[in-house]
């Protein structure tokens, strides 16, 4: 993205963590039960900032499309400038296959991520600079596949596909995103 900088001056320094077996104070779906999240569906989680850069309108389109399914459930956890907008969407639509959780203590959030099956990353399709959301790390730490809908300038999706841990489409492409959901079920 910066052709004026020579390749010899650029170094990739990837984020990394050690993967260990994790212990949770919840077992047998206790946390899911506490949060009224079903245990008999594939659980897809979006956790983090709910702001304009995340393309919340497309996330809401995905949640609406998911209402036609009976085997998947979307868990949205977070806060941000667009929280009111998505909260209003939940009040107006009362979806059966998704929930909105405003925030959780870190350990409880980590336990929730580990109880889910698929991670989600959304970015607004109007981004013009690369963006690499850090929420990916908690998904990878839990060895979960990741579905991504981002702009064309962010390379997180192609990197995920190349390395076999996720699927990607451009944000706004609802048909392909729902095909990705079907693929992971």
Regions found by a protein language model. Give the residues of each.
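Conserved donor-binding/catalytic core segment of Leloir-type glycosyltransferases
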Residues: 38-54, 60-63
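A short helix/loop element that forms part of the nucleotide-sugar donor recognition site in Leloir-type
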Residues: 22-37
